[in-house]
C-alpha cells in the first residue's frame, strides 16, 4: 500500500535537479567567456575586472559598451614638427637679398661647434663692439688697474659701463675706450684671438660669436662681473631685432648695433640646457630702420631658433 503523502516529493526533486543543472551551465558559460576575454588580443585588466564583477549579475551586454578602447583604437598622435634644414633656410634667405651683405654665425657654447653662413668677413661692427670694450674694462678692474668707482666723465666707470651696454651710449663708449687706451684694447682683443682696431671698428661675425661664448661660459670675467654684464644685455633700449623674434621660453642677452646701413644683433640664446651665441650682421642700401630690414633679421632668427630649439 502506497503512502499518498510522499508523491509530491518527486516533482520537487526533479525541479531541484533542473535548477542545479541550469546553474552549472551558467557557471560554465561564465568560465568560457572569461577565458575568451583573457586570451583575446587587446584585452586589458580593466575589461577583465569589469567582466568578473558584472557578468554574473546579468549585465553582460554592457561589457562591450564599457570596454576601454585598445591602443589600436586610440586617437592618432599629432605629427611631429618637421626639422628645420638650417643651411638650406639660411641660403634661401640670403639668396633672396642679393643687394645685402648678410653674415650669420652660430656657436654652441657647450661644445664650441661653430656654424657660419653668408658673408662672414669683417663688418663695421657698430655698437656690438661695445661688448668687447666692456669686457676689457672689467678685466682691468679684476687685475687692479681700474676701479668701477673711479670718476669717469660726469659719473663713475660703473655708470658708464651700464649706459654703454644697456642704452648704447656712444659718449660712454668713447670715455671707456680712452680710459682703457686704444693700444691696450687692441692687445686685449688679441689675447682672445680677435683682430681689432678701435679706429676702424671692424669685427667678423664669427669673432663676435666667440667673444659672447667666452663671456657666458665664464672664461672672460669673474662670476660677479659676468652676471652684471649679461644683466645689462637684457631689457635694453632696443628690443626690436632678435629679442622680438624669439619664442617664449628662450632667454636672450644681446647687444645690437645700427649705423649707416649696418644693422646687427649679437645675442646669447638659451633654453634648458642649450645655449648658443647667435650673431647676425647685415648691411643694405635700404634705411637701417626699415621694415624690410627688420623682417630680414626676424626671418633669420625664426629659422635659427626653429633649428636650434625646435621653436
What residues fall within each predicted segment?
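Penicillin-recognizing serine hydrolase domain
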Residues: 2-5, 14-69, 81-102, 107-109, ...
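Acidic/histidine-rich, surface-exposed loop or edge segments in extracytoplasmic proteins
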Residues: 59-77, 110-118, 166
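N-terminal Sec/ER secretory leader and immediately downstream segment
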Residues: 103-108, 114-116, 125-127
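Active-site SXXK
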Residues: 112, 122-152, 164, 278
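A glycine-rich, coil/turn loop motif that links secondary-structure elements
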Residues: 119-124, 153-154, 197-205
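Conserved catalytic neighborhood of penicillin-recognizing serine enzymes
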Residues: 145-186, 193-195
Amino acid at each position: 500500500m502506497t503512502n499518498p503523502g510522499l508523491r509530491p516529493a518527486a516533482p520537487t526533486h526533479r525541479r531541484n535537479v533542473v535548477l542545479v543543472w541550469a546553474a552549472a551551465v551558467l557557471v560554465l558559460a561564465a568560465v568560457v567567456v572569461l577565458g575568451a576575454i583573457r586570451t583575446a588580443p587587446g584585452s586589458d585588466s580593466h575589461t577583465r575586472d569589469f567582466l568578473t564583477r558584472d557578468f554574473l549579475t546579468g549585465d553582460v551586454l554592457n561589457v562591450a559598451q564599457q570596454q576601454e578602447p585598445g591602443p589600436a583604437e586610440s586617437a592618432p598622435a599629432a605629427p611631429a614638427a618637421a626639422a628645420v634644414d638650417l643651411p638650406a633656410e639660411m641660403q634661401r634667405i640670403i639668396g633672396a637679398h642679393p643687394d645685402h651683405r648678410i653674415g650669420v654665425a652660430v656657436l654652441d657654447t657647450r661644445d664650441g661647434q661653430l656654424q657660419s653662413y653668408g658673408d662672414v668677413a669683417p663688418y663695421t661692427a657698430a655698437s656690438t663692439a661695445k661688448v668687447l670694450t666692456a669686457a676689457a674694462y672689467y678685466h682691468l678692474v679684476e687685475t687692479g688697474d681700474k676701479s668701477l668707482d673711479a670718476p669717469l666723465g660726469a659719473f663713475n666707470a660703473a655708470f658708464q659701463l651700464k649706459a654703454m651696454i644697456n642704452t648704447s651710449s656712444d659718449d660712454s663708449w668713447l670715455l671707456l675706450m680712452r680710459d682703457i687706451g686704444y693700444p691696450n684694447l687692441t692687445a686685449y682683443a688679441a689675447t682672445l684671438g680677435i683682430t681689432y682696431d678701435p679706429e676702424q671698428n671692424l669685427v667678423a661675425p664669427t669673432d663676435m660669436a666667440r667673444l659672447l661664448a667666452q663671456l657666458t661660459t665664464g672664461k672672460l670675467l669673474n662670476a660677479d662681473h659676468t652676471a652684471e654684464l649679461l644683466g645689462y644685455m637684457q631689457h635694453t633700449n632696443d628690443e626690436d631685432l632678435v629679442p622680438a623674434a624669439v619664442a617664449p621660453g628662450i632667454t636672450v642677452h644681446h647687444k645690437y648695433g645700427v649705423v649707416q646701413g649696418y644693422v646687427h644683433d649679437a645675442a646669447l640664446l638659451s633654453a634648458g640646457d642649450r645655449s648658443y651665441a647667435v650673431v647676425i650682421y647685415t648691411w643694405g642700401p635700404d634705411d637701417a630702420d626699415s621694415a624690410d630690414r627688420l623682417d630680414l633679421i626676424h626671418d633669420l632668427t625664426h629659422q635659427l631658433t626653429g633649428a636650434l630649439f625646435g621653436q
